[in-house]
């Protein structure tokens, strides 16, 4: 799938933009501050920020509410999501249609670029080249995801047996050929910038008579910020079904998945409070890399 066209899985899986906006979580002040510090944007007045694949504006809202007074261009190709974002009329935010490989910005416009909850959809050399074009020299590209444990990569350890079971249920859907954060292949686009191991010293590579050099620094920086949240089983289900691979389930497949979900959430290892809410664990995953 070209990064200059809307991925079919995203177009269908996120068709209900209002539900996505209602049930997807925002970003904590702790995670946001750490993230912006890594991007060298924290406390920088009026910095120009590209919010790429802004969706319904979960991250855009957080950025617009901060004290820096960022000048934000929020780029989103999904018409329904972009409409939800435009309704919010956020201060300092200009909303534009566009794709990762064809950004509606001039060269070296941005002091920093942010991709929240979406980089796995367009982790391609073409997208990196275009992001590199619009960033100022040495500016930082940051990618961020809220990852509940049901959506984590399988090599990450779960906090509880029931969350591990829910994670296994999500993985039982198998691969539909669509890119997912939990498959953890999005990092390859950075590591594969060179034909040799990116952790070794950069070597010359003969490529059409020139040097093939990386566009962004490697290895990427990484940090996890843990979080917990109490949710009713219904709210947990509503959040879970905002995942595109679950949102597209229909008929018997949807019913069978929901039955398995209900059985897991009714399990003995689930911690509940007096309101009947269950305790859900997750991390906000941060990664960043500098434009070279």
Language model segments and positions:
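Conserved catalytic/acceptor-binding region of the Class I
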Residues: 137-229
């Amino acid at each position: 799938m070209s990064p200059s066209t809307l991925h079919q899985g995203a177009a269908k899986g996120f068709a209900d933009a209002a539900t996505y906006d209602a049930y997807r979580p925002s970003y904590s002040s702790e995670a946001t501050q750490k993230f912006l510090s890594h991007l060298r944007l924290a406390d920088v007045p009026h910095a120009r920020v590209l919010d790429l694949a802004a969706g319904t504006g979960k991250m855009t809202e957080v950025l617009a509410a901060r004290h820096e007074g960022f000048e934000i261009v929020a780029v989103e190709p999904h018409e329904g999501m972009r409409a939800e974002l435009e309704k919010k009329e956020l201060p300092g935010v200009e909303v534009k249609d566009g794709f990762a490989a064809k950004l509606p910005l001039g060269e070296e416009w941005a002091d920093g670029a942010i991709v929240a909850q979406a980089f796995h959809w367009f982790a391609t050399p073409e997208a990196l080249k275009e992001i590199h074009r619009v960033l100022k020299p040495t500016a930082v590209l940051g990618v961020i995801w809220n990852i509940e444990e049901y959506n984590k990569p399988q090599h990450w350890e779960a906090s509880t047996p029931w969350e591990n079971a829910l994670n296994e249920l999500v993985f039982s859907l198998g691969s539909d050929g669509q890119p997912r954060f939990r498959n953890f292949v999005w990092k390859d686009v950075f590591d594969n910038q060179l034909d040799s191991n990116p952790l070794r010293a950069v070597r010359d590579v003969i490529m059409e008579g020139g040097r093939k050099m990386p566009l962004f620094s490697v290895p990427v920086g990484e940090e996890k910020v843990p979080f917990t949240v109490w949710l009713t089983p219904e709210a947990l289900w509503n959040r879970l079904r905002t995942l595109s691979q679950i949102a597209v389930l229909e008929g018997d497949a949807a019913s069978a998945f929901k039955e398995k979900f209900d059985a897991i959430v009714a399990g003995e290892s689930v911690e509940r409070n007096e309101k009947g809410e269950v305790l859900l664990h997750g991390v906000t995953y941060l990664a960043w890399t500098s434009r070279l």
